């Protein structure tokens, strides 16, 4: 390849995406050749990955994260919705059996389930990332074995929340107004 007068840029890696078909080409045009999808509607992503693989749609390589959410009035409608620790563990097994490389635990999952869910994911060779479930702290999720806490506000909320404040709502963003007065 004669690159005289040009610039060679390696493919970029999007570390936290939620990819849809309309995003696939846009990512490539921006130089993103791999997207770490952090939770999606499983059948939609299955179709997109298949279409990219067949060359029907131009898009990046996609690394999938299995999304596990507890059922509540605030639940995300993405991934697997669970109502018990056993269902959460079954969801981990479902994702592992389909070649996902990690699971992402979300806001409404009962934080008491995290140690068992994380243990099963690690036993199966999966990483665990996620939001800090409501009514728990980043410290508790790290102690439960999280490999990664997504979004820096999820780490910092523990410094400014009062007991019982619900982070399943947009409050997880608006509570950040308290940061300027924080004295660590």
Feature locations, PLM:
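Divalent-metal coordination cores built from histidine and acidic residues
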Residues: 3-9, 15, 19, 23-184
């Amino acid at each position: 390849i004669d690159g005289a007068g040009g610039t060679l840029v390696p493919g970029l890696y999007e570390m936290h995406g939620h990819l849809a078909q309309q995003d696939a080409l846009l990512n490539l045009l921006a130089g993103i050749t791999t997207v770490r999808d952090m939770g999606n509607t499983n059948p939609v992503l299955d179709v997109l990955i298949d279409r990219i693989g067949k060359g029907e749609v131009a898009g990046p390589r996609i690394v999938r994260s299995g999304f596990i959410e507890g059922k509540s009035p605030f639940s995300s409608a993405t991934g697997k919705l669970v109502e018990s620790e056993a269902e959460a563990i079954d969801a981990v097994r479902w994702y592992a059996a389909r070649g996902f490389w990690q699971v992402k635990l979300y806001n409404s999952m009962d934080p008491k389930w995290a140690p068992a869910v994380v243990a099963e994911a690690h036993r199966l060779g999966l990483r665990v990332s996620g939001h800090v479930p409501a009514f728990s702290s980043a410290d508790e999720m790290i102690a439960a074995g999280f490999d990664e806490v997504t979004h820096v506000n999820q780490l910092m909320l523990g410094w400014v929340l009062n007991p019982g404040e619900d982070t399943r709502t947009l409050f997880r963003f608006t509570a950040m107004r308290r940061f300027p007065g924080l004295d660590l």
